[in-house]
UniProtKB/Swiss-Prot annotation:
Record protein name field: Large ribosomal subunit protein bL33B
UniProt similarity note: Belongs to the bacterial ribosomal protein bL33 family.
NCBIfam families hit by this protein: PRK00504.1, PRK00595.1, rpmG_bact
Keywords for the protein's UniProt record, in alphabetical order: Ribonucleoprotein, Ribosomal protein
Example of a GO biological process term: translation
GO MF annotation, one: structural constituent of ribosome
The gene coding this protein: rpmG2
Length: 54
């Protein structure tokens, strides 16, 4: 039942350094595409785009 969950847990990775920094949930019905947010990356020490990894 978890495989068809409407709100799965996803991991966000930094676009610059590829480090996986954040874990969040998303709604598959509202956001079927890959999620992208601007978050702080401690490795880059800057606000960078973080994209959903699969």
């Amino acid at each position: 039942m978890a495989a068809t969950d409407v709100r799965p847990k996803i991991t966000l990775a930094c676009v610059e350094c590829k480090e996986r920094n954040y874990i969040t949930k998303k709604n598959r019905r509202n956001n079927p595409d890959r999620l992208e947010m601007k978050k702080h990356c401690p490795r880059c020490n800057a606000h960078t785009a973080h994209r959903e990894t699969r």
